[in-house]
Amino acid sequence: MVTTTAKNVGYITQIIGPVVDAEFPEGDLPAIYNALLIEGKTDSGLDIRLTCEVQQLLGDKKVRAVSMSTTDGMVRGMKAIDTGAPITVPVGKSTLGRIFNVLGEPIDELGPVEIVDKFSIHRSAPKFTDLVTQPEIFETGIKVIDLLAPYRKGGKIGLFGGAGVGKTVLIQELIHNIAKEHSGVSVFGGVGERTREGNDLYNEFKESNVLGQVALVYGQMNEPPGARMRVGLTALTMAEYFRDVSKQDVLLFIDNIFRFVQAGSEVSALLGRMPSAVGYQPTLGTEMGDLQERITSTNEGSITSVQAVYVPADDLTDPAPATTFAHLDATTVLSRQLASLGIYPAVDPLSSTSTMLQPAVVGEEHYNIARGVQSTLQRYKDLQDIIAILGLDELSPEDKLVVNRARKLQRFLSQPFHVAEIFTGSPGKYVSLDKTIAGFKRVLQGEFDDLPEQAFYLVGDLDEALEKAKKLKDEGKS
């Protein structure tokens, strides 16, 4: 949405794809990032009304802008109105449960949105004096994350995983848990991904009853680079309102952060900037920093961001993922191997990392238990080749014990999700961090070496596992 406060009127002089040049009267040039409203009729008589964002002042009374929608049908000489302000989008509770485009216009065919307030998508990062510097764990209620790769409140998390390993379900569960346990809300920014995926996500949110706690902002693959480059800022702006005005904890999902960089690269080339390494824009670090620095904890609330990261050609040294990694506090890696074993969430306990997992932050007990779980699982992984060739019987008694315990730990890291109840028939579980630590401590110490590993599969806390073991024993007797 654009707010027209000034009425400097110019006209279009050149159109090259999504890039538009406009000429304005002397002394009335629009500022960088101002929104221009383009109005006119096509040769066939159709009305055109679209928004562009000023990117360059060319001199000679001309500006260069990038369009937020397709420029099909545009002709030279059309009117360009300077709105006098950057793109502004609606913010507040009325955005929850709705889908918006980059301009903050609803695209879900559910009618207009009640606009209480509007924010500019270009905002400064919070002041240093307003930031919370004490690291604090953001409890998700998901055992494997809270124990082995905990999220930082106001931090940035990279979500890595291929198709069909459970990214969407994990995102839905996080949205459910922040709403139910933290009275928080979520904003989902679909940046340059498939329209079909955006549609599927909306329907899945609807089915799992989390749609009312999330605002969706889409700038999909088929849209011009201007829209894909700015849709992340639109989603972030909506999240900032909930943090700064509503004083809530917010989860911001960006899928996919690589597409944000890719769109910036396209725009940079169209604007005639000299490319840098691998053809990326020379301003890559600055653009990424401008977005990421706004995602943080303040004295009012927090924005915790989960960002799906596509790694081109699996090359982690590519400038796009490499620049992203510099900002991440944690990584959650989803494993196809675990998914094929039926262990959900399929979070890889050995590949997922977090800067929070250190004794000074989580405490000695949590740290030692997490490292104990990881070393047991690593030893099991090392032994798998031997088991495949020689079988379990050829292992030493110590190694047999490690394998037995590791298989229990692996299954105990699985958990039924609230949002998957309709598929699994099992009620979802939110497990507090204290219960998670206490449960894994006892399993690691070998207290339950005599229990069947099946008792630990898809349960919440340890009490539930013991109850399941008793049930299995009773069934075995009968």
Curated annotation (Swiss-Prot):
NCBIfam families: atpD (TIGR01039). Gene3D superfamilies: 2.40.10.170, Bovine Mitochondrial F1-atpase, Atp Synthase Beta Chain, Chain D, domain 3, P-loop containing nucleotide triphosphate hydrolases. Belongs to the ATPase alpha/beta chains family. Pfam families: ATP-synt_ab, ATP-synt_ab_N, ATP-synt_VA_C. InterPro entries: AAA+_ATPase (IPR003593), ATP-synt_VA_C (IPR055190), ATP_synth_F1_bsu (IPR005722), ATPase_alpha/beta_chains (IPR050053), ATPase_F1/V1/A1_a/bsu_N (IPR004100), ATPase_F1/V1/A1_a/bsu_N_sf (IPR036121), ATPase_F1/V1/A1_a/bsu_nucl-bd (IPR000194), ATPase_F1/V1_b/a_C (IPR024034). It is found in: Cell inner membrane. Keywords: ATP synthesis, ATP-binding, Cell inner membrane, Cell membrane, CF(1), Hydrogen ion transport, Ion transport, Membrane, Nucleotide-binding, Translocase, Transport. Its main location: membrane. Its EC number is 7.1.2.2. It comes from the Bacteria. It is a peripheral membrane protein. F-type ATPases have 2 components, CF(1) - the catalytic core - and CF(0) - the membrane proton channel. CF(1) has five subunits: alpha(3), beta(3), gamma(1), delta(1), epsilon(1). CF(0) has four main subunits: a(1), b(1), b'(1) and c(9-12). This is ATP synthase subunit beta. Transmembrane segments: none annotated. It catalyses: ATP + H2O + 4 H(+)(in) = ADP + phosphate + 5 H(+)(out). The keyword Oxidoreductase does not apply. One of its GO terms (cellular component) is plasma membrane. It is an enzyme of class 7 (translocase). One of its GO terms (molecular function) is ATP binding. SMART domains: AAA (SM00382). Produces ATP from ADP in the presence of a proton gradient across the membrane. The catalytic sites are hosted primarily by the beta subunits. ATP binds at G161, G162, A163, G164, V165, G166, K167, T168.
